[in-house]
Amino acid sequence: MDARDIILRPVITEKSADLMDSKKYTFDVALTATKLQVRDAIEEIFDVKVKSVNIMNVRGKEKRVGRYTGKIARRRKAIVALTEDSNDIKIFKDENNE
């Protein structure tokens, strides 16, 4: 699998933004991705050194619109911790460099 097929998108929430201060970044990853694949993909895409990877499966939820029900797809979330000497990952565009 290609590195860009493993890392789908960053997860942007208040909790993940707080974790960024301690060099921990949250990403949605492919459902079949392992910790080693996530580590290698992050190191390849962002040119950083990964300290640890924690992965969790988020179950799909049922949602309703009126009398119709549907299901939100399940997903797999990875929290990646970088080493202290590693550079930060730039998820947001700098306002000064536009």
UniProtKB/Swiss-Prot annotation:
GO terms for molecular function: rRNA binding; structural constituent of ribosome. Gene3D superfamilies: 3.30.70.330. Keywords: Ribonucleoprotein, Ribosomal protein, RNA-binding, rRNA-binding. GO terms for biological process: translation. GO terms for cellular component: ribonucleoprotein complex; ribosome. Belongs to the universal ribosomal protein uL23 family. Part of the 50S ribosomal subunit. Contacts protein L29, and trigger factor when it is bound to the ribosome. One of the early assembly proteins it binds 23S rRNA. One of the proteins that surrounds the polypeptide exit tunnel on the outside of the ribosome. Forms the main docking site for trigger factor binding to the ribosome. This is Large ribosomal subunit protein uL23. It comes from Lactobacillus delbrueckii subsp. bulgaricus (strain ATCC 11842 / DSM 20081 / BCRC 10696 / JCM 1002 / NBRC 13953 / NCIMB 11778 / NCTC 12712 / WDCM 00102 / Lb 14). The lineage of its organism: Bacteria, Bacillati, Bacillota, Bacilli, Lactobacillales. The gene is rplW.
